């Protein structure tokens, strides 16, 4: 499904670009871009390749293990674990969309990406990233229902409702990414083709456009800002009710267990929103720190999410022990 959407998007955008070329005739269209990537001394190419390769393999295997565990362990066939399965798939796919091209650059020096490849990369990243943003909000709502309305949870969050909400996050991500990608690549690219970034992203592409990008920058800020702020406020509201409900639990053990179920989700939300805010919710810049932050939220964050959810989630740790054939360690 994702591949079909990407191919349709690419066809529409390239058709639009070709029509503009025929109309303007005096502009030279860019056929490819060069991903500058991380600035580093040549002798660090091999060590960086090995470091990012290890991170990439750990990310794919860690998130893949979470998905496998949720699918095979019937005790995890619950809404929160289903949402976690979606999150792991998103993290794994984001890593697969960005990291292989970086690895090729470190090892082979191959940093060229076709115009169509750049379109697909930008679309994929914003599609997956926006879907993840909606999913975090949905997971907070699920925790709100489970802790604040436990007696009604099973009747509200049915299997059908759970699947419908999860599908809604994917549709929302598709709409957002189609809008952003088409808005960026309707601009003419007729000269510079060096993308001073680790992948084709909106701020970096706007700097290469042969036209005024003020409207694009404003629309990007408004669109991403509205979505991020709305989702973040909904998450904060949900956790405000959750904390109030937890504090009313009489036993210390009960409060501790309730907090532990929410700690992992809150941690990954913070890890997601801080770099997102830094990159998109400020004026377009070309600071070296941008590349470092981009590496963090495209390479490091997907790995951190899998680690956080396996270390902070008691149910997931127990399920992994069962999957590995180890006896569960019962607390004394």
From Swiss-Prot:
What GO cellular component term, any one, is given? plasma membrane
Q: How does it sit in the membrane?
A: Multi-pass membrane protein
Q: Which GO terms describe its molecular function?
A: G protein-coupled receptor activity; olfactory receptor activity
Q: Give one GO biological process term.
A: detection of chemical stimulus involved in sensory perception of smell
Per UniProt, which keywords does this protein have? Cell membrane, Disulfide bond, G-protein coupled receptor, Glycoprotein, Membrane, Olfaction, Receptor, Sensory transduction, Transducer, Transmembrane, Transmembrane helix
Q: What InterPro entries does the record tag this protein with?
A: GPCR_Rhodpsn (IPR000276), GPCR_Rhodpsn_7TM (IPR017452), Olfact_rcpt (IPR000725)
User: Does the keyword Cell division feature in the UniProt annotation?
Assistant: no
Which cysteines does the record link by disulfide bonds?
118-210
Specify the superkingdom.
Answer: Eukaryota
Q: Which PROSITE patterns match?
A: G_PROTEIN_RECEP_F1_2
Residues in the Extracellular compartment per record = 1-46, 97-120, 182-218, 280-290
Which ranges sit in the Cytoplasmic compartment?
68-75, 142-160, 239-258, 312-332
- The reply to whether Glycoprotein figures as a keyword in the UniProt entry is yes
The record's section on SUPFAM superfamilies has: Family A G protein-coupled receptor-like
Question: Which Gene3D superfamilies did the record assign?
Answer: Rhodopsin 7-helix transmembrane proteins (1.20.1070.10)
Q: What is its main location?
A: membrane
Cell compartment(s), UniProt: Cell membrane
Write out the transmembrane intervals.
Answer: 47-67, 76-96, 121-141, 161-181, 219-238, 259-279, 291-311
Tell me which family the UniProt entry assigns to this protein: Belongs to the G-protein coupled receptor 1 family.
Identification of the protein by name: Olfactory receptor 10G6
Species of origin reads: Homo sapiens
